[in-house]
């Protein structure tokens, strides 16, 4: 037995190894071949499962396990790692589970009472003679311990006894049995049991061994059978080789060192696998496509791409997977289980790889660097997507329905749902369904109010990491997505994708009601509300409802007076960002929207569309009260207020109300005295631009008749 001090030292070494991330699952795993598994009884198998799961959970608790091994997924589903082959009876016979060697000893010879050292006990055991009745040969116990008496296909096998660790049990003096040593297959004598003395014939392949001294069989209950125990942590193992590997966790021993990079391993198999990184060796080749792999397990998984085999099916939704680990991870969508928790912030994840990626947020580690531009990423998948998007242009994943290609498999899967309409992720609070799991996660934060992502500059919080990343570009001015056609840059890749459809003319989203097509799905969703009349976003101040949340936000600024968008040229502020963009074209003189009929150019696209109706005569907006039609939606809205009498714009100074915001703006200038329109000839200022235009005719000499006809009688000069 190790001293308490040695145990503590071993524990410190284990903690140190784990803190350095040097322990892998394979370091603490217990491996059985199918043959070995069939030899284990029920108690041993149960113990194996318990130890394996405990080892794995210990690693996960300190974040040292990246992906879940298939064997753990099986054990969590209470399945065996091996299926017992039919027609084979390879397990131990219940009556022959253990073979014990003993000798009738008097009380004064009792080994326990004498407290003899292990060396003396071994000497006494070596003195016992055994005779093989078939071969007619005498055996010393010393020889017996060093030979394999029975081959692997028989009831029991005994191998070399290397040393005796402990004598642990004292028996009553009245017990007839002496001290007994368990000769187990893993070469340790661990326990002392009382046994009834008798002669025992051991039959194996028609061979019989009988002892001249006393040999007995102990009918030990299967559930109490002991395996090898680690003295440091008391974990149980079935093989000496597995125990030896396990003990290297406590000692930190890594005897197998790579001569290329100096990295050391606790197992030779791990070294051999690691060396393929340096040699580039990929000995396992796919016969279908020729792709090679460094590990056979990777080849087996890859081959399912060709066969389409998905042997692991979810019992909840019948979705099938090619890998057991993927099924186990998927099932957590249904259960909501998130067993992997970040020790820094407490955030939990459904798989340990997501936890590993998340922890890099805290550490700032970005181990995957692009060889073309030097940009670094936290995940290898992000690097692969980056290179395909910016450098190689590769889009290896094609949609079989429409032929559209994607840079990654996830993009293809998500795209396919636009064809199938599948929305497998359902909110358990409101029942809303989503095509992407990430969309469900973000949606659920509406119910919880959670905003875990905070800007370190302005402290604004967001419910989605992507929203924070996009927001931070407002501070940095970064626009990493540039159009190759016109050079225009964007903060978001989706904005670039939408913009590129201007050049391609692509409008992939079609309305099923009127067949109108759109370049963006969001525009289609907005359009469909015209048919449904849906206006789900209501103002709490005045009760006005809107079909889009952006319109509600913009409307609420009428009540708050907020104008967060300021022109850097003149300081004028606006309630909407689009208004600022349009206003800035006054300073730049830019008119990017040109009519193909007459060549007239406009600052706003909406103005061009409205103008084109002059050529076409189109009046798509009709009043449902009087039938009058309009070429502009805004004109219809203003007209309808004649019927309703609605005057939603009220002056805060005198409470006078107006049907149009422009009328309110003009009225406010009476109170403020503001006259923003100044004549460059004489300096006279006016509240309205139309008044300035009329005044300027005095200087140009235009007919006063025109002026008088244009103004009400009392305004004629």
Swiss-Prot record:
A zinc finger (C2H2-type) spans 228-250, 256-278, 284-306, 312-334, 340-362, 368-391, 397-419, 425-447, 453-475, 481-503, 509-531, 537-559, 565-587, 593-615, 621-643, 649-671, 677-699. Highly expressed in testis. Very low expression in thymus. No expression in other tissues tested. Expressed in a differentiation stage-specific manner in mesenchymal chondrogenic progenitor cells. GO terms for molecular function: DNA-binding transcription factor activity, RNA polymerase II-specific; RNA polymerase II cis-regulatory region sequence-specific DNA binding; zinc ion binding. It comes from the Eukaryota. Keywords: DNA-binding, Metal-binding, Nucleus, Repeat, Transcription, Transcription regulation, Zinc, Zinc-finger. One of its GO terms (cellular component) is nuclear body. One of its GO terms (biological process) is regulation of transcription by RNA polymerase II. Pfam families: KRAB, zf-C2H2. InterPro entries: KRAB, KRAB_dom_sf, Znf_C2H2-type, Znf_C2H2_sf, Znf_C2H2_type. Belongs to the krueppel C2H2-type zinc-finger protein family. This is Zinc finger protein 470. The gene is ZNF470.
